[in-house]
Swiss-Prot record:
SUPFAM superfamilies: Winged helix' DNA-binding domain (SSF46785). It comes from the Bacteria. It comes from Janthinobacterium sp. (strain Marseille). It holds the Pfam family DUF480. InterPro entries: DUF480, WH-like_DNA-bd_sf, WH_DNA-bd_sf. This is UPF0502 protein mma_2112. Belongs to the UPF0502 family.
Length: 232
């Protein structure tokens, strides 16, 4: 399924200080954080490269269809809120952009890697996060992932929520608390949703391994595109 960006502001602030982003802003921030680690030679990012990253078919849930105009508008909102900075490099013909998540939320790379994967893919288990974040940060054990998750949960306002186990599943799931989405508490998960998560858990490991290989291909494509742009 493909999601379109909404026309609402990129971010809002709740009474408790929690910042709520729309789906487009979450995707833009996550892609900036992801590509900073995966393709540092192509970072900061141009609007064209950022749009392609937002609409990437792999390692994204949901798949989106943002235009460069959409991304430009989102960037301006995020710049105003100081989550993104515009970078004008010497000799460059286009502006480029970088995220400021480390500074805004005081995050080390392991915590940023976990949050980035959650922002890109939504609800996941610690095991799935460990597998999918390997190229952003190498976690030695699942316990290390859980420690990073706990840090994000304990922040005020929290950036991540621990969700109840779905019926028929063994692993705890985690969700990013950056949107207006309301997550169920213990005992409230609908049967249909539980069934979907159960199936997701069964195939998660294989899906993550395939996505990791696809990410490598996307990284190579981005590097090649950056090389081509030097001659344009």
């Amino acid at each position: 399924m493909t999601d379109e960006v909404s026309n609402t502001a990129a971010a809002d602030v709740r009474d408790n200080g929690q910042i709520v982003f729309d789906a487009g802003a979450i995707r833009v921030l996550a892609v900036l954080a992801e590509k900073e680690a995966l393709t540092p030679d192509a970072y900061p990012m141009s609007i064209n490269a950022l749009t392609n990253g937002c609409n990437q078919l792999t390692s994204r849930d949901p798949v989106m269809a943002l235009t460069e105009v959409d991304v430009q508008g989102i960037l301006q909102e995020l710049i105003a809120d100081k989550f993104v900075a515009e970078v004008n490099q010497a000799g460059a013909r286009v502006s480029k952009y970088e995220h400021r998540l480390r500074m805004k939320w005081s995050l080390e790379q392991d915590k940023l890697a976990v949050l980035t994967v959650l922002m890109l893919r939504g609800i996941q288990t610690a095991g799935e996060i460990r597998t999918r974040s390997g190229r952003l940060h190498e976690f030695a054990t699942i316990a290390d992932v859980e420690a990073a998750l706990q840090f994000l949960i304990d922040k005020y306002p929290p950036l991540v929520a621990r969700l109840p186990r779905a019926p028929g599943t063994k692993e705890t799931r985690y969700a990013p608390l950056l949107s207006s989405e309301v997550f169920p508490e213990a005992g409230e998960l609908p049967v249909a949703a539980a069934s979907g998560v159960s199936r997701h858990d069964r195939i998660g490991q294989l899906e993550a391994e395939v996505s990791s290989l696809r990410d490598e291909v996307e990284a190579l494509k981005a590097q090649f595109q950056q090389f081509k742009q030097q001659f344009e």
